[in-house]
Amino acid sequence: MDSVSFFNPYLEANRLKKKSRSSYIRILPRGIMHDGAAGLIKDVCDSEPRMFYRDRQYLLSKEMTWPSLDRVRSKDYDHTRMKFHIYDAVETLMFTDSIENLPFQYRHFVIPSGTVIRMFGRSEDGEKICVNVFGQEQYFYCECVDGKSLKATINNLMLTGEVKMSCSFVIEPADKLSLYGYNANTVVNLFKVSFGNFYVSQRIGKILQNEGFVVYEIDVDVLTRFFVDNGFLSFGWYNVKKYIPQDMGKGSNLEVEINCHVSDLVSLENVNWPLYGCWSFDIECLGQNGNFPDAENLGDIVIQISVVSFDTEGDRDERHLFTLGTCEQIDGVHIYEFASEFELLLGFFIFLRIESPEFITGYNINNFDLKYLCIRMDKIYHYEIGCFSKLKNGKIGISVPHEQYKKGFLQAQTKVFTSGVLYLDMYPVYSSKITAQNYKLDTIAKICLQQEKEQLSYKEIPKKFISGPSGRAVVGKYCLQDSVLVVRLFKQINYHYEVAEVARLAHVTARCVVFEGQQKKIFPCILTEAKRRNMILPSMVSSHNRQGIGYKGATVLEPKTGYYAVPTVVFDFQSLYPSIMMAHNLCYSTLVLDERQIAGLSESDILTVKLGDETHRFVKPCVRESVLGSLLKDWLAKRREVKAEMQNCSDPMMKLLLDKKQLALKTTCNSVYGVTGAAHGLLPCVAIAASVTCLGREMLCSTVDYVNSKMQSEQFFCEELGLTASDFTGDLKVEVIYGDTDSIFMSVRNMANESLRRIAPMIAKHITDRLFKSPIKLEFEKILCPLILICKKRYIGRQDDSLLIFKGVDLVRKTSCDFVKGVVKDIVDLLFFDEEVQTAAVEFSHMTQTQLREQGVPVGIHKILRRLCKAREELFQNRADVRHLMLSSVLSKEVAAYKQPNLAHLSVIRRLAQRKEEIPNVGDRIMYVLIAPSTGNKQTHNYELAEDPNYVLEHKIPIHAEKYFDQIIKAVTNAISPIFPKTDIKKEKLLLYLLPMKVYLDETFSAIAEVM
């Protein structure tokens, strides 16, 4: 064990780590010994692990020199000053028994135990560096009658073993205001309790809370204290004024390691990055029984790992392949050959330690690749891999939050941790930022890179791999291409810059940005502003403020459904919820919880919000400006400054950084409201969340009332907005037809289009000035003409003569087949781009059942009916392309795990298994078509009809035309339902009734006809 040992109680169950063993289980495919041979060889090996590179043998050890890498010795530094950039930091503990090589001036901070902040980054010269920071105290506040009794209680907790660790602590009186609830007086009998050990601080705080003490800020972790209390950046540049190198007994695996006191650090505002090293990696496995590999199954081994090493900027592209068995050379690739899986995995982790990338990416590596490697080393080989991180006693691990276990393979969000490494998995990034039918790497590469993967079926991988060195090279190229594609995706989306900006803004680590929710990012911001105002945050017990939590959500006005062939103006409230919170001073710090605190104030100083039987009151800014309001104001002002700076910026990289910064500010602003409404959050407050939505409803209703009462005459538009009589084409009619949370749809009849477009922004400004407090602002967004308003949150509209806007309609659903989508799209296009159909649709929507029977449908509607007839012909005459009839569902878990077995995509998988064809993996989207039933039974279930599209094409199986046409009728009816007249007949039946009748004979009748 190193003379400097660090312990993180959140990551380690105990301080005794597993020891590396001299012997190990050796598992390898028989085919790498005898070409083409199936099965595995399993035995125990006593020889030293080794690898082969370019026909030379290398023994594997942590301190080995990696053959393909050139390591340059670090230079000597001036001990009086150093400049460095950090991308990550972790909290660790040091104990008395570990101080032998620690400089004397830092020893008292860790006797008997103490916190050490480890910061990872690059020096100004590009050297990888670890900075050990001493002197950061961890503390909380506690209400108690006197300090002596509190000290005795804490001493007793340490002595009785509830904490199982001791450290120095200090108790001192504190004079602070509570953030929660308006009050003019500081908290009575308040003490600040400071500890040298962050773990002890948190444990003591929780125990005191459970014993009934009122405590504050026990949930604030020591890294947040470090960044907030000192005004430090969690991602950025620092000067260290004075430091001492750690030459002996290092705690890190980096060549440069220094020690300093927290007061020696100075944070700098430079936003530029140094060059950071990155990896993109991918693994290939062999499932022993042909099933999807399970890391805990002994025989489901890793056979290859590809790594592409690159930098955050520049063109460096170094490719590495770790493989079992010998492998033919691949151009431009370093190939490392291993005799067993354990040696391959060990070689990979040694390479991780030696090359030591700061960022690691891949595609679904959190849920699969990294998780698989960790489980293999832990469960199969019982080998501790934390030493391969940036810390010698570090951690490489995974965790799945309890609530995520119930989710499927791709839906579960696994948290991964490696000391000093940031994981940026491109799968969750791209699946959250773009819309696609599925999120397989091949699909995303086609959409975003216009590149297609070279396919190698899962059946071919084992055959190729055991066939010999040339076959393993084929598998290696296939493995490498995934890593290469991910590098291109990584550089295209630049998510790492976005993460860094959020981290800087929120005073949290980049790891927190990636793996934690919004409240973890907002909480430190609130803490920062509260600290500036001498306020402290109460620690909520689990039941406090959560009983019966829930409130009426955002208002959606009942839409006046219909087909509108006249212009509809859409207005949006700019940053609605943040604006409401700022305008009305809504905050924890302004909420009135005790009426005695406002006894000396007049009612004009108080905002009262009534919600049914409940009333919430807040003091106005003249009494106290809210903490949340101040934060929001600052962020929005910064965003305006950043966007202005972007306009004048010519440097592409700086412009990218500025864009990520303004996006981080926008996201953070929009998250504040959610923090107050999170029932199980750090600072829930139903009074704030409910008041925001209540005031939002009032704004929506007041806008509707104003439009319906004040904006109904030509005189209004002439006097207020400068129109003249020539701007009107008939009797003016203005009405609000829909309101959805922060949007208002206003239909305007008989006003010239050019005039309406000119005054639309003026209308928004007029309503804003008349009705709302600053900074609430109604903005003109767009004009839709025509508009099909189907129901709440579902509409289709045409913008700017050519662009169709879809919201919540079947046309864009992932589960609809392309054929159905195409028919719906054609009919929607007729309604929006064919004037004859538009005129007919308006007439059709106002017809009665009697008029329909006597007059028939308007002429323009026949174009819609003809398109439906064409689709019917294609389906019933088997002329539709099977590839356009494919439906799909995601296989979210193993087939056996489904409680409902009668699902279409599961039926397809069973058919494939029966025919011994390739079985999809968990996470894949399963494509299928519905085939004609053999019995002619119309009531056959979909799962009985579902078949693999390739099998249908190969065997020319007829499809179930009636099922598909039924889907078309339903989808078309849903999309254009507002144009149907109001009759007693169901709309789907009416549409079928309007179509000309036609009988389609199947092959049986054709055969009879031939005989006759």
UniProtKB/Swiss-Prot annotation:
InterPro entries, sorted: DNA-dir_DNA_pol_B (IPR006172), DNA-dir_DNA_pol_B_CS (IPR017964), DNA-dir_DNA_pol_B_exonuc (IPR006133), DNA-dir_DNA_pol_B_multi_dom (IPR006134), DNA/RNA_pol_sf (IPR043502), DNA_pol_B_thumb (IPR042087), DNA_pol_palm_dom_sf (IPR023211), DNA_pol_type-B (IPR050240)
SUPFAM superfamilies, alphabetized: DNA/RNA polymerases, Ribonuclease H-like
Reaction catalyzed: DNA(n) + a 2'-deoxyribonucleoside 5'-triphosphate = DNA(n+1) + diphosphate
EC number: 2.7.7.7
Compartments (UniProt record): Host nucleus
Keywords in alphabetical order: DNA replication, DNA-binding, DNA-directed DNA polymerase, Host nucleus, Nucleotidyltransferase, Transferase, Viral DNA replication
Molecular functions per Gene Ontology: DNA binding; DNA-directed DNA polymerase activity; nucleotide binding
One example of a Gene Ontology biological process annotation: DNA-templated DNA replication
Main EC class the enzyme belongs to: transferase
Gene Ontology CC: host cell nucleus
Pfam families, sorted: DNA_pol_B (PF00136), DNA_pol_B_exo1 (PF03104)
Similarity section: Belongs to the DNA polymerase type-B family.
Function (record text): Replicates viral genomic DNA.
Name listed for the protein in its UniProt record: DNA polymerase catalytic subunit
Lineage: Viruses, Duplodnaviria, Heunggongvirae, Peploviricota, Herviviricetes
